[in-house]
Amino acid sequence: EKDIQVIWGYLQVGEILSAPEKQKEAWWRPHSTDERTSGTANLIFKASERLSLDNTKPGAGLLPFDKKRVLTLEGATKATWAMNEVYDTQHIYGKRKNGAKDPIKGLYYAGIWQELGLMESDACTEWARSILL
């Protein structure tokens, strides 16, 4: 079977640590090292205590596999995601180019990254609710 990319966890941001002295207090995190905290682009995101969509759930957690959490476009390479307005180039933070072979059906963001910052919208909230709950 082909590899696929799947949403396997979530984190609702409760606090952003941007000051180096605050980052160093979180000594167990990889981004709290002197090498990381001496730069200007380092941030540490701490989870909220509870998930705002469902306050019975913690602010961060793991999710079991479910087809509704599969990002990969069917039949495509794992890094080509099915098109979704919520995470298209107009609705994410940062400048990314869609390099998919068929940009109408799929999204392909080149580069090494783990996180994708989505712009807040009603559509984003409903999408998050549909995959988390």
Task: Name each model feature, range by range.
Residues 3-8, 15-133:
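Contiguous surface segments at macromolecular interaction interfaces
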